[in-house]
A protein has these predicted regions:
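Residue-level signal for short, function-critical loop segments
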Residues: 35, 112-114, 147
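Primarily recognizes the serine-hydrolase "nucleophile elbow" in alpha/beta-hydrolase
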Residues: 10-80, 90-91
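Cap/lid segment of the alpha/beta-hydrolase catalytic domain
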Residues: 1-3
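The feature captures the conserved acid-bearing segment of alpha/beta-hydrolase catalytic domains
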Residues: 55-77, 86-129, 133
């Protein structure tokens, strides 16, 4: 787990440190991913310590857009510990552990709760609620009705609208 989150954080830090070389705007960096990638996007930005290692404030991220990301401790980590995949855990490897009201704008996208894997919609709904309870104002959740875990293509217009609403270009 640590290696994966560290690699994802290093990749985001690289973008911050190099985006201007490619005529990009460091104020318009969005972090996204699907499934395990959504989990890594969440961990990289919600737990501010990961980007702080590179002298980057995680709140500099313009937006966070996980597609069907685990918000509890990832099932691979639970499996490594001998914990069944259906047993939810919230510890330092869970984005839920780090909920905070000052996080970047966030768009949570999941498949249909009846078709999505392992309660992923419910995890994201709880994350959404706890972020709101902690004062997060700019957070939305979308459940892609009729879609399972493979809802990414259907969700891309939501991502594009979210980015467009928060950028100059």
């Amino acid at each position: 787990a640590e290696t994966s989150v560290a690699d994802a954080s290093r990749a985001v830090a690289w973008v911050f440190n190099n985006i201007q070389k490619f005529n990009g705007d460091p104020n318009e960096i969005f972090v996204s991913g699907h499934s395990a990638g959504g989990y890594l996007a969440l961990m990289t930005v919600i737990d501010k310590d990961w980007l702080a290692k590179y002298d980057i404030d995680a709140n500099s991220v313009a937006g966070l857009i996980p597609f069907s990301g685990h918000t509890i401790t990832h099932f691979t980590i639970r499996k490594e510990r001998g914990i069944p995949g259906e047993q939810p855990i919230i510890d330092k490897w869970a984005p839920l552990y780090y909920v905070r009201g000052d996080a970047p704008p966030t768009l949570l996208i999941t498949g249909d709760r009846e078709k999505e894997m392992l309660g992923r919609y419910e995890e994201n709904a709880y994350f959404y609620r706890m972020m709101k309870v902690n004062g997060q104002k700019d957070i939305k959740i979308y459940e892609m009705d009729g879609y399972g875990h493979n809802m990414t293509a259907a969700g891309f217009p939501l991502l594009l609208n979210f980015v467009k609403e928060r950028t100059k270009n």
